[in-house]
Amino acid sequence: GYVGRGALDIQAVGDIFAAPSGQLVFEALQKADKGHGVLLLTLNYAGDQLAGKQAMKLAKKAGMNVRQVVTGEEIQFDPNGEDNQRGLAGAVALYHVAAAAARAGKTLDEVAEIAQKYADSMASVTVKVTDATHPQNGMSFGDLGETDLMEIGAGQHGEGGGVRVPMMSAKDTVATVAKALTAKLGMTSGDKAF
């Protein structure tokens, strides 16, 4: 989980590979509200976005002070050229950045601004060498099968949408991914990230 000191106060969780309901997210917002407002951190996935929007509407109707930050840092190697960036592992660091700002006494608006700036300044990419399998029903996510291919930009659960390339060594894979990450962030050799 992601709940604890220096991290989230509460987390709304759906079923395996599924988003929580908007009602569940709203109930989590209510439980997290200690009178200073609540920041809702959401990954850019359709189900998470839908639940977040529904929860935000319910929170507004209830008179709650809530802000939302969406992370969509994944570089998707979409062969169709669509820019549909999904939220990935960068969200974990985002949780800690937002928590640190809150613990430092920042207002909700300041915490949201810091978190959004961080979310907009990061990038991640996935590399899939085998298909993911649902632990309950054994369903496979993807169709790489027994090939000599790997997929770059396959998403959090390996759901696909990236580009398939011949299997590379770890060194070549890192070089490919690093080039994409630095390009996305507008960095060149010698630049400092922080």
Segments the model singles out, each with a brief description of its role:
Residues 4-35, 182-184:
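Glycine-rich oxoanion-binding loops at beta->alpha junctions
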Residues 49-63:
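Short Gly/Thr/Asp-enriched flexible loops that form oxyanion-binding sites at enzyme active sites
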